[in-house]
Amino acid sequence: MSIITDVLAREVLDSRGNPTVEVELYTEDGGFGRALVPSGASTGEHEAVELRDGDKDRFGGKGVLKAVGHVNNEIAKAVIGLDVTEQRLIDQTMIDLDGTPNKGKFGANAILGVSLAAARAAADEVGLPLYQYLGGPNAHVLPTPMMNVLNGGAHSTNTVDFQEFMIMPVGAKSVREAVRMGSETFHALQALLKSKGDITAVGDEGGFAPNLKDNEEAFELLVEAIKKAGYKPGDDIALAFDVAASEMYDAESKTYTTKWSNPDKKYTTEEWTDMIDGYINKYPIVSVEDPIDENDWEGWQTFTKKMGDKVQIVGDDLFVTNTDYLKKGIDMGVANSILIKLNQIGTLTETFEAIEMAKEAGYTAVVSHRSGETEDTTIADLVVATNAGQIKTGSMSRTDRIAKYNQLMRIEDQLGAQSLYKGRKSFYNVKAID
């Protein structure tokens, strides 16, 4: 038993230059943990609350001094004296102290910082890597990455409707090889864009946002880049994309619109599903995220019934890493995968519960970054600890993204012959892929 003796939070900056919370936690036997909390740009309406100050004279209202104050006062008093290895007790203590269903009193950014710092301090104290401390001796599966190399929708200023276009090195034999394949394709894509006179500046997640006219052009460009890098589309590197459909849904008329490329065009759920199905039939796509609005549960049922056997269907805004929404989805036969974002739910314990529930129901789990990231690499350890098998952590540029890939390669080296990279077999619940 090792007691927490001190907790200290401060306001620091994330990868977008916006304030975020950093927490340091100390134990009586010399254990130390530090954690930084990420932040999302496009967020689901059911996510846990990210507490901001609202003072327009500081950081345009985005300061986090209130959250920092809650850590340094109420939360610190509650967790000091607890055993640092009692993760569930630490997390539940904070949840109970907050007392709201969405962590609206203290903020999920305050609570998550303490939750992650405690886990790191416990791992430090027992002398284990974080992934091994969290996952035990069976933590050995390295994830297949989703690399966001092209951006559209709300993440760009072009007329591409879908928000993210990703490559997945499904044919790699290791994380190290997957990272190399991704890097080579990223640079091939950059060269193609330059040759076309397009913009090659990168966005929040390290991907390009060139002036493309529509989704079709984005898919064609990725296939061309994969070939240019010397790989076979589909066999070596497959495609994935995030529709972010909630950005294009009108709840009143129950229709979708191609908001950026052709805002006057309206689609019923069936027509929208058919449009996406057309892309999946034409291109080597293995995963689609948020194809339907987060509140259109009937639409999700329609989409899953038609597409569930041919592609991974990931719920992000739909599930927000929350077991209540995930259980509803499982009961309704909605989606077949969940995106896992630590700050959507706000504690490590609840994150583990969501991953476990997904696995028990035969859903895959994709551990994910946020658009506002930091140098913190916890999600790399988390995805190995849980043997989740897939990670979404940005493109092949920006240190805040690369830090996670570098950590995965370190973990793979540490595991040696015990490590397992599943590649295409990460989609174990989709008949047409595995």
Curated annotation (Swiss-Prot):
Cofactor note: Binds a second Mg(2+) ion via substrate during catalysis.
Binding site for Mg(2+): 242, 289, 316
Molecular functions (GO terms): magnesium ion binding; phosphopyruvate hydratase activity
GO term, biological process aspect, one: glycolytic process
Gene that produces this protein: eno
Protein name per its UniProtKB record: Enolase
Keyword Kinase annotated: no
UniProt main location, coarse: cytoplasm
InterPro entries documented for this protein: Enolase (IPR000941), Enolase-like_C_sf (IPR036849), Enolase-like_N (IPR029017), Enolase_C (IPR020810), Enolase_CS (IPR020809), Enolase_N (IPR020811)
GO cellular component: cell surface; extracellular region; phosphopyruvate hydratase complex
